[in-house]
Amino acid sequence: MRLAAGALLACAALGLCLAVTEKTVRWCAVNDHEASKCANFRDSMKKVLPEDGPRIICVKKASYLDCIKAIAAHEADAVTLDAGLVHEAGLTPNNLKPVVAEFYGSKENPKTFYYAVALVKKGSNFQLNELQGKKSCHTGLGRSAGWNIPIGLLYCDLPEPRKPLEKAVASFFSGSCVPCADGADFPQLCQLCPGCGCSSVQPYFGYSGAFKCLKDGLGDVAFVKQETIFENLPSKDERDQYELLCLDNTRKPVDEYEQCHLARVPSHAVVARSVDGKEDLIWELLNQAQEHFGKDKSGDFQLFSSPHGKNLLFKDSAYGFFKVPPRMDANLYLGYEYVTAVRNLREGICPDPLQDECKAVKWCALSHHERLKCDEWSVTSGGLIECESAETPEDCIAKIMNGEADAMSLDGGYVYIAGQCGLVPVLAENYESTDCKKAPEEGYLSVAVVKKSNPDINWNNLEGKKSCHTAVDRTAGWNIPMGLLYNRINHCRFDEFFRQGCAPGSQKNSSLCELCVGPSVCAPNNREGYYGYTGAFRCLVEKGDVAFVKSQTVLQNTGGRNSEPWAKDLKEEDFELLCLDGTRKPVSEAHNCHLAKAPNHAVVSRKDKAACVKQKLLDLQVEYGNTVADCSSKFCMFHSKTKDLLFRDDTKCLVDLRGKNTYEKYLGADYIKAVSNLRKCSTSRLLEACTFHKH
C-alpha cells in the first residue's frame, strides 16, 4: 500500500505519468558531448513549448548500434543516423524506419541527399582503379560515404577470401584509419589512427576527421561527402590543392562533384519504431525546434552546431528538417542501388560478369486470381517466369523497386507513379495491330458511359450522380475524368461532387466506396467485384449512373460476349457515351465522343532488369501469345478466366517502345501535364514517398 501511495505521489509531483510518457521523446546520445548538447536541447525546448507540448529525456548509450537496440526495445525513441545505419536499423529484429530527414543547401533549394566522394591531393598520381596499396581515410565503419559506398564499389577488387570484410580491406590498403573498427583483430585498419576511436572526441572520426587524416599526410585518399570539402576548405585556393577521383578513372576539380562522385546518398534521418514509434510527436518536436533554434536563429542554443564538437545529434551542415512520408520504410528511403550495395557487402556477393544473369523474371501478381494465372505461366514456361504477390498495384511497384519482384503490366496512371519511383517502361500492350514489329500504338480512348434509359445525364450535370471507376490513379477510370472535372470545379472533393460511387483504392469511409461490393470492399484489385474496366461497367449496370472506362469495354461485355449472368443479356444499344460538348452518342462513335486518348498499358521494370524482362517476354509471347489457337487447352498470356489478369485480355501482342523507354517519353507531355495537375488531389502514399528526395 505504501509503495502504491508513493508511486501516486511521485506521479502527482511530476504530472500525470501516462501523459508524460505519451508526450515525451527519449533522445539517444552516443557520448558525453552529445549528452551535453541533448541536455541543452531539452532545457531550451522547455522554455519555448507550452506545458502540454512534447518533452525531451536524454538517454546515453555507448554507440549508435546500442541506440538502435534501445529504440527497438522501447528504452529510447529517436536518434539521428547516417544512411548506412538507417539500413541497419531497418533490418529485423530492429524494424525501425526513418521519420524525419535532415535537408541541406537552403530553404529555397533544399536537398535530402549528399554526394559521396573520393578526395585526394592534387599531384598524387593514381586513379580510382589504382587504390590497392594506398593508404585510406574513412569516416567510420559501416557509414555511408566513408565505408559502404567505397567498399561496395571496390568489393570485387578486394583479395579473396572477402570474409571477414575488414580483413580483406586491411589487405587491400597498405594502411587505414577506420574509426569504430576492431583494432585488436584488424590492426591495419587502425594504423593511421591508433585505437580507431569511435566518437567525435577522436581527431580522425567522422567527415572532418577523415579529411584531417588526408590533410595531415597520413592517408592518400579520404572517403567523405562533398560538403566536407567546403566546410574544411573555405577558400578556392585551398580547394585547388585537392581533386576528386571519378568512376571513369579520371580526376576532376572538387567543385565538379555533381559530375564526379561515387554515389548519391540519402541524408541523415531520425529513426523510430515502425509500430508505436511516436513519429508525429517527434516531428512536432523537431519542427518546433527548427522554428526556434534552426539556421539563422539567434539564441544561446543552436540546433545545427555546438561548442562541444562537430555533428552532435544532427549534422552541422543541415539546414532544417522534412517529415518523411508515412509510406516510406528504410528501403524506400535509401533506394534500390544503395540497398543493393549494402546487401552485397553483408552477404558477400560479387557478380561474375561472364555469368548470364537473365535466368528468370519474377512477375508481380495482384490478388488470388492473378496469382493462379501467374503460377500456371510459371509452370508452363519451365520456371522462366517466377511469381510474387501483392495486394495493390502500389505494393507491386514497391516490390519491384526493392528487387523483390521484377516486372508487371500497368495502366498509364500507374506507369506515371512507377516512373516517379525510378522504374522504366519496357514493352507496350498493342490492342489493334498484331504486327508486333511496328512502333507501339498511340493509345486507346477514355470514355464516360451511361444507360440509354437515363437520358437526362450529360457531361455538364454529373454532380450528385453515382459514379463507377476502374480504380483511383488509373487512367480511363480516374486520371482523365477527374482531371477534367478538377479543371472545372477547382477542388479535390470528388466524394462530395458525386453522391455515391465505387472507386477502388479510395478511403474506406469515403462515399466513393459506398457502391463497391467486395468481397474486399473498395480494394484496388480483383477481390473487389467492381474493380477494373469490366468491374466499373458492371457497377453501372447494377448500381451507377456513369462509368469511366475504355471505349472497348461496352463492346466486350454486350451482345453475348460476356457470359456472366449480369452481362449475358446486355445489348450495345442499351448504352451511350457522354461527349465533352454536352451531347451523347452511340458507343460505336467513340472516335467522335471521348474524354481523351490514353496511353496503352505497359510493362515496367527496374533499369538494371529492363533488358532481361524485355527479351524474356518477347520470347515467351512467341509461344504463349495470340498465336495459340485454343486457350482452353494451353496457357495464353492474353486470356483470363476472369477479366484482364496480368495483361488486358484484348492485347494482341507486346511491342518494343522504339526509344520511348522513360515514363515521360512513353506517356507524352500532355498526359504528364494532366496527371501532374491532378497530383494535388492524389492520395497515393507511394507517390508521396517516391518524390520525397526530389525537393
From Swiss-Prot:
Cross-referenced Pfam families: Transferrin (PF00405)
Residues annotated as domain Transferrin-like: 25-347, 361-680
Coarse class of the protein's main subcellular location: secreted
Gene Ontology biological-process entries: antibacterial humoral response; intracellular iron ion homeostasis; iron ion transport
Compartments where found: Secreted
Single GO cellular component term: extracellular space
Modified residues (Dimethylated arginine): R42
Binding, hydrogencarbonate 2: T470, R474, A476, G477
Binding site for Fe(3+) 2: D411, Y444, Y533, H601
UniProt entry keywords in alphabetical sequence: Disulfide bond, Glycoprotein, Ion transport, Iron, Iron transport, Metal-binding, Methylation, Phosphoprotein, Repeat, Secreted, Signal, Transport
Metal-binding found in the keyword field: yes
Residues where Phosphoserine is found: S389, S682
Entries under InterPro entries matching the protein: Serotransferrin_mammal, Transferrin, Transferrin-like_dom, Transferrin_Fe_BS
Extent of the signal sequence: 1-19
Glycosylated position list: N509
Residues that bind hydrogencarbonate 1: T139, R143, A145, G146
Disulfide pairings: C28-C67, C38-C58, C137-C213, C156-C350, C177-C193, C180-C196, C190-C198, C246-C260, C358-C612, C364-C396, C374-C387, C421-C690, C436-C653, C468-C539, C492-C681, C502-C516, C513-C522, C579-C593, C631-C636
Keyword Coiled coil applies: no
Function recorded in the entry: Transferrins are iron binding transport proteins which can bind two Fe(3+) ions in association with the binding of an anion, usually bicarbonate. It is responsible for the transport of iron from sites of absorption and heme degradation to those of storage and utilization. Serum transferrin may also have a further role in stimulating cell proliferation.
Family: Belongs to the transferrin family.
Subunit structure comment from the entry: Monomer. Part of a complex composed of SLC40A1/ferroportin, TF/transferrin and HEPH/hephaestin that transfers iron from cells to transferrin.
Protein name as it appears in the record: Serotransferrin
Organism of origin: Oryctolagus cuniculus
